[in-house]
Amino acid sequence: MKIILTHEVSGLGAAGDVVDVKDGYARNYLIPRKFAIRWTKGGEKDVEQIRRARKIHEIQTIEQANQVKAQLEGVKVRLAVRSGDAGRLFGSVTPADVASAIKAAGGPEVDKRRIELGSPIKTLGAHETSVRLHPEVDAKVSIEVVAA
């Protein structure tokens, strides 16, 4: 089945790409989660609109990515969350929490889908995360999780 990706999907492509996937994968996973829409002849207009929107928000060059990387690595990110007595969090820290903490700390605005936690953050203390700015540039961000 031909689909148009509306979001970046690991292993398939970026938003605006037209890809061919198995019917079940499209119907049961991609389309219900709004990662893709069905390809139609009229969908070509949607592809151009998605590509234009992506171009505005995307970091275009490696130089831009390196500038954002320098800004990110210079920011001290501190995240206050509720926790129990043993230092375990109620829930976990999400990429959206990290993105808002980076912005609150004076860093650049980062898309939550670009933040890779590795494993869920469920304890207090210092943690390392990676932000994928460009296919060739990753920024390491250290986050200090403290009790609220």
UniProtKB/Swiss-Prot annotation:
<dbReference type="InterPro" id="IPR009027">
    <property type="entry name" value="Ribosomal_bL9/RNase_H1_N"/>
</dbReference>
<dbReference type="GO" id="GO:0003735">
    <property type="term" value="F:structural constituent of ribosome"/>
</dbReference>
<dbReference type="InterPro" id="IPR020069">
    <property type="entry name" value="Ribosomal_bL9_C"/>
</dbReference>
<dbReference type="InterPro" id="IPR020594">
    <property type="entry name" value="Ribosomal_bL9_bac/chp"/>
</dbReference>
<dbReference type="InterPro" id="IPR020070">
    <property type="entry name" value="Ribosomal_bL9_N"/>
</dbReference>
<dbReference type="InterPro" id="IPR000244">
    <property type="entry name" value="Ribosomal_bL9"/>
</dbReference>
<keyword id="KW-0687">Ribonucleoprotein</keyword>
<dbReference type="Pfam" id="PF03948">
    <property type="entry name" value="Ribosomal_L9_C"/>
</dbReference>
<comment type="function">
    <text>Binds to the 23S rRNA.</text>
</comment>
<keyword id="KW-0694">RNA-binding</keyword>
<dbReference type="GO" id="GO:0006412">
    <property type="term" value="P:translation"/>
</dbReference>
<keyword id="KW-0689">Ribosomal protein</keyword>
<keyword id="KW-0699">rRNA-binding</keyword>
<dbReference type="GO" id="GO:0022625">
    <property type="term" value="C:cytosolic large ribosomal subunit"/>
</dbReference>
<dbReference type="Pfam" id="PF01281">
    <property type="entry name" value="Ribosomal_L9_N"/>
</dbReference>
<comment type="similarity">
    <text>Belongs to the bacterial ribosomal protein bL9 family.</text>
</comment>
<dbReference type="GO" id="GO:0019843">
    <property type="term" value="F:rRNA binding"/>
</dbReference>
<dbReference type="InterPro" id="IPR036791">
    <property type="entry name" value="Ribosomal_bL9_C_sf"/>
</dbReference>
<dbReference type="InterPro" id="IPR036935">
    <property type="entry name" value="Ribosomal_bL9_N_sf"/>
</dbReference>
<protein>
    <recommendedName>
        <fullName>Large ribosomal subunit protein bL9</fullName>
    </recommendedName>
</protein>
